[in-house]
Design a protein with these regions (language model features):
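Structured secondary-structure scaffolds
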Residues: 1-197
């Protein structure tokens, strides 16, 4: 992880302190530890190796790879198999990952480590001889959480401010204003109906 730690330190001037602090803090406090990339599950992407039945890839190992693999598949489906390189091997390309605080480490440290670790074999196969390194995230402007009346917003518990319902009662401009002034940029915030009204 020394390369990832350096990568994070190099972004201190323009990444949010919370993103740098959480990612770099985890690396510095825990050190470089092996992480399992499989789970014993009956759902998910099965490990395609005989004898590994019942093992699936850990969602955060394979999910971030989806950014790259989806772009490669898109290029192939659209008849220009090399088109993905315009983003993934172009030093001018800038990838931004807008996420919530619970996914910071995976996008700010884990994913860059995977990209750094792909190595020459991948690049020779996909990008060609002497291919450019893969594009690392330019910024990960992660937000903290916005709660509702001091409770975690949850779709499965039907606890939230639903846009369609909101717009039947109120104009969108007050919503835009309230979300702007209460945005959880550096700390968790709370939607409070009394404050909104």
């Amino acid at each position: 992880m020394p390369n990832v730690a350096r990568y994070l330190r190099d972004r201190k001037s323009y990444w949010r302190d919370t993103v740098i602090g959480q990612s770099l803090g985890q690396i510095e406090s825990e050190g470089l530890k092996p992480r399992a990339i499989t789970r014993d599950l009956d759902w998910g992407i099965p490990v395609p190796i005989q004898g590994w039945e019942g093992k699936c890839l850990y969602v955060w190992f394979e999910a971030v790879i989806g950014y790259l693999s989806a772009t490669i598949e898109w290029a192939q489906v659209n008849g220009d198999a090399a088109a993905w390189k315009e983003w993934w091997t172009n030093p001018q390309a800038k990838a931004f990952h807008f996420i919530g605080k619970d996914n910071i480490f995976f996008h700010a440290a884990w994913w860059p480590a995977q990209l750094m670790g792909t190595g020459a074999q991948f690049l020779e196969i996909y990008a060609g001889e002497g291919g450019q390194p893969l594009t690392l995230p330019y910024d990960v402007p992660a937000n903290m959480f916005m709660n509702l009346e001091n409770r975690k917003i949850s779709g499965s518990h039907n606890w939230g401010v639903w846009g369609r319902d909101f717009l039947t009662r109120y104009d969108p401009d007050p919503l835009r204003y309230y979300l702007t002034v209460t945005m959880p940029e550096n700390r968790d915030t709370d939607w409070n109906w009394d404050d909104f009204l």
